[in-house]
């Protein structure tokens, strides 16, 4: 008598697509994914890069990428230095895209996480942050030393944008603050 195969129990993963506005956003999101999304956690996170060009392009990139896959949650991380027009907000709402803003830019958010002073101008934030990371903010490895899981967990309690990103990494969608 032949052995009967034991059926493999498969779990359905919650799928999350997060689009970063540029290279820095993608590298930071990849770092978060590496820290928070582990095998067997029930979540599959995909990170993509919209390559800039403003909020409209980032939302369009999210919509295009979402059409190529069946994602439970679609979100974008983008700067707030350029205005989010009503048209951009409407498009995001219609396509169920969660918008996470980094004020005034992702470099400012990262400086805030580190407890550093955050200048009002995006260009100054970029200069300060690039100097802080030895000018290598476009690769995931640049974040390993300064952005530990313990620091991110602690700062996630007080920084709304980071709290949303950490929730997305867990497959949860937080209501807008």
Model-derived features: positions:
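C-terminal accessory helical subdomains adjacent to catalytic cores in phosphodiester-
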Residues: 1-15, 26-49, 56, 60-177
